[in-house]
């Protein structure tokens, strides 16, 4: 088939991959930084600082998955039935995926887990984006401060090693 007749991809590849199983979610919950507001909780794990743990023939799924592909971040969505019916839950998930796609450069190298609360449905997209950006930038600032403190030998911050 000639190249002129071949259809181009209509959608670019998404800049994120999803967290796949309970152990990946649990790792982000345990080792990640968390931030809460009235609308959702955000758990962030910096994968560039995580040393890959390799056993016999076993690759660490979180840190190796970013290197294997051209994905920028890993995304997990945990939307409870308490948030609303399926239509409301799916709307929230679509909005959160869209936020990560729009701000892929900010999310680069992170594993993110969103846990929306029931009030999240009542936010419009722009208010949700504002809260997301505030939380993500404050977490990144806190992580940078904690990393500097760890390098100095100070452990008064709640930095995780």
UniProtKB/Swiss-Prot annotation:
A GO BP entry: tRNA 5'-leader removal
Top-level class of the enzyme under EC nomenclature: hydrolase
EC number(s) recorded for this UniProt protein: 3.1.26.5
Gene Ontology molecular function: any one: 3'-tRNA processing endoribonuclease activity
Gene3D superfamilies: 3.30.230.10
Gene Ontology CC terms: ribonuclease P complex
Recorded catalytic activity of this chain's protein: Endonucleolytic cleavage of RNA, removing 5'-extranucleotides from tRNA precursor
Quaternary structure note: Consists of a catalytic RNA component (M1 or rnpB) and a protein subunit.
Family note: Belongs to the RnpA family.
Official protein name in the record: Ribonuclease P protein component
Annotated organism of origin: Helicobacter pylori (strain J99 / ATCC 700824)
Lineage: Bacteria, Pseudomonadati, Campylobacterota, Epsilonproteobacteria, Campylobacterales
């Amino acid at each position: 088939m000639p190249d002129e007749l071949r259809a181009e991809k209509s959608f670019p590849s998404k800049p994120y991959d999803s967290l796949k199983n309970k152990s990946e979610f649990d790792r982000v919950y345990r080792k990640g930084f968390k931030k809460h507001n009235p609308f959702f909780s955000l758990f962030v794990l910096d994968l560039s600082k995580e040393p890959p743990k390799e056993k016999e023939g076993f690759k660490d799924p979180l840190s190796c998955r970013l290197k294997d592909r051209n994905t920028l971040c890993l995304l997990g969505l945990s939307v409870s039935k308490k948030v609303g019916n399926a239509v409301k839950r799916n709307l929230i998930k679509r909005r959160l995926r869209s936020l990560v796609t729009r701000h892929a450069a900010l999310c680069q190298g992170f594993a993110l887990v969103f846990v929306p609360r029931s009030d999240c449905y009542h936010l419009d997209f722009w208010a949700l984006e504002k809260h997301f950006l505030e939380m993500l930038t404050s977490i990144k600032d806190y992580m940078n401060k904690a990393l500097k403190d760890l390098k100095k030998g100070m452990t008064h911050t709640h930095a995780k090693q």
